[in-house]
Amino acid sequence: MAREIVVAGAGVFGLACAWELLRRGQPVRVVDSARIGAGASGGHVGALAPHAPETWNAKKQVQLEALVAADGWWADVAEAGGTDPGYARTGRIQPVPAGAEARMAERIAGARAHWPGWAEMALTTTPDTPLVPVSDSGLWLVDRLTARISPRRACAALAAAIRARGGEIAEGVTTEGPAIWATGVAGLGPFGGNGV
């Protein structure tokens, strides 16, 4: 059997790393000096929004691929652990400032060139959503790619999936040995630079 990999940090990033390792057959142990979701992952809402599609680059492509894969990935997490992560692909509506129409046209052209067709970005004068922000121009930019997640529920769902798959999560514990460090800014302090 493969040697266990330690992941330091039980926020969304650390737990997601551990879950992906387990999915690939690698035993893992997650440690957190406090508790699951103690840092930024203990927040109320997370937006999973795509980078602006104009001036495309490799970083934007990697992020797009992750957003496209998110539906299935979070569904697998929910199924494995029996806990809803609070993920939904909700789309996004943004008011367009007066005079920004040409810039929005560039953005829409970039989305058409790089995003999957179902993700559609478009301008509208009649948004179909119950909450519509004020738009001085009378235009809104909408997309179907943006998603949202509950960080707290995501952590709970990932922890449940990890435990269901045989992974260990130890709270109130640190590690001195080699690990995947996913401890956020607070965990960087011992490495110097005041976490910067």
Model-predicted segments: where are they?
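Flavin-dependent oxidoreductases
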Residues: 16, 61, 177-196
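Helical element adjacent to the flavin cofactor pocket in flavoenzyme catalytic cores
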Residues: 140-178, 182-187
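N-terminal Rossmann-like FAD-binding beta1-loop-alpha1 element of flavoenzymes
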Residues: 3-29
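Conserved Rossmann-like nucleotide-cofactor binding loop
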Residues: 13, 36, 186
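Glycine-rich FAD pyrophosphate-binding loop
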Residues: 23-42
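Short beta-strand/turn micro-motifs composed of small residues
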Residues: 9, 32, 97
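Dinucleotide-binding Rossmann-like beta1-alpha1 core, especially the glycine-rich loop
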Residues: 46-130
